[in-house]
A protein has these predicted regions:
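Short beta-strand to alpha-helix junction loop
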Residues: 64-67, 102-103, 138-157
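Dinucleotide-binding Rossmann-like beta1-alpha1 core, especially the glycine-rich loop
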Residues: 49-128, 134
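Glycine-rich FAD pyrophosphate-binding loop
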Residues: 26-46
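Conserved Rossmann-like nucleotide-cofactor binding loop
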Residues: 17, 40, 209
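A conserved short coil-to-beta-strand element within the FAD-binding core of flavoproteins
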Residues: 166-183
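N-terminal Rossmann-like FAD-binding beta1-loop-alpha1 element of flavoenzymes
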Residues: 7-33
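Short loop/edge segments at beta-strand edges and connector loops
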Residues: 36, 118-119, 152, 168-170, ...
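Central helical "cap/lid" subdomain
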Residues: 189-225
Length: 225
């Protein structure tokens, strides 16, 4: 490893995950550079921001992982809001899941974590719901965050204040590999210049487009996700 790459992080992808990782490394005194083609096209600007570990009906290890992750969010958001000065819109407002019969309700993987709603109380939570939905579960521990208008902008500002370097319009052509170790990336920048960026660690955060960098990854875009 080159001496000048110590504690340097190259993040490929400037969406919600890329910015979140950049923020954590930067606030712990790493040198961080974020590459993105067009950050405004990231999923974080269109995703609903649901924190729905229980309402999504997760099971087994994934449920435990989701619960642990969800428990960390308030403190994490508190740090981002403090550094950025932007309210991220975190709300523990609860999420309602309706059911047409009790059998379906009791088969729902996380039903034991929810508060039962009869039809009368379900209508109070979801005004105008079709009468065929007779039962519901209110997961009071779930909630939402304002990704599009607040969290993404807050992360951008917090990262900038921690001296994260952003390279917009960057197209990663390939990773630089030597002796089975990733040393950096070959990048075509917005001005058409090809450059090599060396670093201690490369973190791939391209979401659905990760296969463009590593074509053996079993990742593909899904409508609505």
């Amino acid at each position: 490893m080159k001496a000048d790459t110590k504690n340097s992080i190259l993040i490929i992808g400037g969406g919600l995950i890329g910015l979140s990782i950049a923020y954590e490394f930067a606030r712990n005194d790493y040198t961080v550079e974020v590459l993105s083609k067009n950050r405004n096209e990231s999923a974080g600007f269109v995703a609903a921001g649901m924190l729905a570990t229980h309402a999504e009906g997760l099971e087994d290890e994934l449920l435990v992982f989701g619960q642990q992750s969800q428990s960390l969010i308030p403190e994490w958001i508190k740090n981002i809001e403090y550094d950025s000065g932007i309210d991220c819109g975190l709300k523990k407002c609860g999420i309602v899941v309706p059911f047409k019969n009790l059998k379906r309700l009791k088969e729902f993987p996380t039903y034991k974590y929810g508060k039962y709603l009869n039809h009368k109380n379900l209508k109070k939570e979801i005004n105008g719901i079709n009468p065929s939905w007779e039962h519901g579960l209110l997961f009071e521990q779930d909630g939402q965050i304002d990704n599009r208008r607040r969290l993404m902008r807050a992360l951008e500002r917090a990262c900038s204040l921690h001296r994260v370097k952003f390279q917009e319009g960057s197209d990663v052509k390939e990773l630089i590999v030597e002796k089975n170790k990733i040393l950096g990336a070959k990048v075509l920048n917005a001005t058409g210049e090809m450059r090599n960026i060396f670093c201690e660690k490369v973190i791939l955060c391209c979401g659905s487009w990760s296969k463009k960098v590593l074509n053996n990854l079993p990742i593909f875009p899904v409508k609505g996700q």
